[in-house]
Amino acid sequence: QDDDTVLLVREYAAGVHRYELGLVKGRIDAGETPEQAADRELKEEAGFGARRIDVLRALTLAPTYMSHQSWLVVARDLYPERLPGDEPEELEVVPWKLQDLDRLMLREDFSEGRSLAALFIAREWLKERT
């Protein structure tokens, strides 16, 4: 994949009873760093590994009553590699051009708050690098 494309996955979202587009995500296993977990989840969900992973920041959902953090990373220099995952069905990988992010953020089937926030942050981070 190229630096102008983000890989999305389409999966069934039981909470809203429909298929949703979103970013690759998953939990950090014991002993893993955020970078290692991101690389593993990318292999499981999208069929790619990353030679380079940049950690941008941690996000919290409701810091006044939850301690959960999500780590926002940008994976680059991808290569094909698949690991078996724990999803009940195979996920569809949907490449999306970064120049079309505004259109993506308005789609009804792209509604997960973490993914929306992550794209805003990543877009600004990428702008600063160019």
What do these predicted regions represent?
Residues 1-3, 12, 76-80, 98-99, ...:
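Short loop segments at secondary-structure junctions
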Residues 1-23:
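N-terminal strand-loop-strand
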Residues 17, 61, 122-123:
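Short secondary-structure boundary/hinge segments and terminal tails
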Residues 26-117:
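Unchanged
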Residues 118-130:
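Charged phosphate-binding loop/patch that engages nucleotide di/tri-phosphates or the phosphate backbone
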